[in-house]
Amino acid sequence: MAAVVAASRSLAKCWLRPAVRAWPAACQTHARNFHFTVDGKKNASTKVSDSISTQYPVVDHEFDAVVVGAGGAGLRAAFGLSEAGFNTACVTKLFPTRSHTVAAQGGINAALGNMEDDNWRWHFYDTVKGSDWLGDQDAIHYMTEQAPAAVIELENYGMPFSRTEEGKIYQRAFGGQSLQFGKGGQAHRCCCVADRTGHSLLHTLYGRSLRYDTSYFVEYFALDLLMENGECRGVIALCIEDGTIHRFRAKNTVIATGGYGRTYFSCTSAHTSTGDGTAMVTRAGLPCQDLEFVQFHPTGIYGAGCLITEGCRGEGGILINSQGERFMERYAPVAKDLASRDVVSRSMTIEIREGRGCGPEKDHVYLQLHHLPPQQLATRLPGISETAMIFAGVDVTKEPIPVLPTVHYNMGGIPTNYKGQVITHVNGEDKVVPGLYACGEAASASVHGANRLGANSLLDLVVFGRACALTIAETCKPGEPVPSIKPNAGEESVANLDKLRFADGTIRTSEARLNMQKTMQSHAAVFRTGSILQEGCEKLSQIYCDLAHLKTFDRGIVWNTDLVETLELQNLMLCALQTIYGAEARKESRGAHAREDYKFRIDDFDYSKPLQGQQKRPFEEHWRKHTLSYVDVKSGKVTLKYRPVIDRTLNEEDCSSVPPAIRSY
């Protein structure tokens, strides 16, 4: 492969337009050396082709499977495939340990029963309830049943969980978690590594991945899926380091690219959380699901947006208003500060609106931790103590942290079944897209429904990353012939890249991105109303049209971050459009989607009353259904369709489904 890379770089002068100088000598040296293979394996199928463009020759690769993304879900899928004998490529725009999984703090849920008796069926119940009955119960069944084994697997990989005095994995309380189907009090189900669980999990999975012969393509930006006759046959990507274009042809493609939190101005997401996989699926003409459901984490640091883990409240922290009241007792009398995230975020917003906010502007509340023993803060929340001092100037042992709800997670994503297979909905039935899988925050299985429970996201990563690998291993064999692609496959992607590289309009990428983020922040926030959402739809549609007038400044091809950020903006815009149009269309309040003009859930039955004598509402007249959104990429027009929620479990005798009810904490 090194020879191929050298050959592709020698073609650089052929690619560059006359107005652009040849690459400097420093850029023509060998690739940086890592302690694992980053450029793929040498094989007979790897070759340079000019079938798309003489200016942009393409390096072709052939694999059994390609995984896009190397966070928790991507790594688990990639080494699961390699372990099963598949020739696997992992394409990632970041070095694996820079993926956003590293930022997760609180923990990973599993009914281990280390603190009190627990049962995965209780975890199942809490997750269904937390989803506000929009979650698919077959997928939730699969995830919660697999959870204990997934955590033990991580422990066996060497993940250094916090421990009890008896040496068991320590489990803390987290929001929305109960015992005995909501009747037995607060559950302690969240396994953690102090308050740096995501960091530990990602490094554990990365270390494990080095055991296997996976080909890592690091700092390669995935541009688009390679689709033929409704099947996915790989991806096309840009090597950021040297500007080469690469086509990865594979029988199986797994998308694990994370969320799109950067559609908002204030969020806990990394700057690289740009919905790349979600947008690739959209451009392929496939639907995305439930993008209107965006989780606002209750405790982002005021003015900075940095995450303060729910584990703070799990360890005994409380939220207070300007009057010193523990106000969550009013909104969730039983769970109080450990109600689900959507409930806490709305409660905080109401306190601020009604004039009980803190600070000179009365525009935030306080998270109080200084009543807890300093030793507990030092051992269980060391990262938070440091973060609060750096970003808020607060010593948590002496004063409270100013906090405000901040965009944190996308419940929606690429629709999949519980096996990780991407699906569409045709003529009233779910249809699998051959060769395409998704997992992690990029996917919508849908285990989170309208609202995710804290510490279910890391569980989602490892369970469904593994599920993708298992499904591929069940349906394919290593070394099977890889389907062919057209000689010019990917030419539209390269044409778009070339257009952006030489874009000479009037609007900077940063300006358009800021307009999008501020529109989303002000028009699709914790509380939403029809008129504001409609205005937001109009504004975003105009911003989407403005993308035709972008101006980029770097005309080079080597490490052109201006170009990469513009490609990411295109991806963000597709996600933002589907989010706000889906929110405007959904005329109800459910989970994280709270409409002030439609304050209640609209289900197939009125679950606030006895069901006897009620007639089921027609599918068109209720909202307990998944949104499927499509975008015409040329015009930006959004089309919405809907599919039913799956209420059955994988085995009703083993785990009974949970019928909808009024949701309270």
Curated annotation (Swiss-Prot):
NCBIfam families: sdhA_forward, sdhA_frdA_Gneg. The gene is SDHA. Pathway: Carbohydrate metabolism; tricarboxylic acid cycle; fumarate from succinate (eukaryal route): step 1/1. The active site is at R341 (proton acceptor). Flavoprotein (FP) subunit of succinate dehydrogenase (SDH) that is involved in complex II of the mitochondrial electron transport chain and is responsible for transferring electrons from succinate to ubiquinone (coenzyme Q). SDH also oxidizes malate to the non-canonical enol form of oxaloacetate, enol-oxaloacetate. Enol-oxaloacetate, which is a potent inhibitor of the succinate dehydrogenase activity, is further isomerized into keto-oxaloacetate. Keywords: Electron transport, FAD, Flavoprotein, Membrane, Mitochondrion, Mitochondrion inner membrane, Oxidoreductase, Transit peptide, Transport, Tricarboxylic acid cycle. GO terms for biological process: mitochondrial electron transport, succinate to ubiquinone; respiratory electron transport chain; succinate metabolic process; tricarboxylic acid cycle. It catalyses: a ubiquinone + succinate = a ubiquinol + fumarate; (R)-malate + a quinone = enol-oxaloacetate + a quinol; (S)-malate + a quinone = enol-oxaloacetate + a quinol. It is found in: Mitochondrion inner membrane. Component of complex II composed of four subunits: the flavoprotein (FP) SDHA, iron-sulfur protein (IP) SDHB, and a cytochrome b560 composed of SDHC and SDHD. Belongs to the FAD-dependent oxidoreductase 2 family. FRD/SDH subfamily. Gene3D superfamilies: FAD/NAD(P)-binding domain (3.50.50.60), Fumarate reductase/succinate dehydrogenase flavoprotein-like, C-terminal domain (1.20.58.100), succinate dehydrogenase protein domain (4.10.80.40), Succinate dehydrogenase/fumarate reductase flavoprotein, catalytic domain (3.90.700.10). The modification Tele-8alpha-FAD histidine is found at H100. SUPFAM superfamilies: FAD/NAD(P)-binding domain (SSF51905), Succinate dehydrogenase/fumarate reductase flavoprotein C-terminal domain (SSF46977), Succinate dehydrogenase/fumarate reductase flavoprotein, catalytic domain (SSF56425). This is Succinate dehydrogenase [ubiquinone] flavoprotein subunit, mitochondrial. GO terms for cellular component: mitochondrial inner membrane; respiratory chain complex II (succinate dehydrogenase). Its cofactor is FAD. It holds the Pfam family FAD_binding_2. It comes from Gallus gallus. GO terms for molecular function: electron transfer activity; flavin adenine dinucleotide binding; succinate dehydrogenase (quinone) activity. Residues 1-44 form a transit peptide.
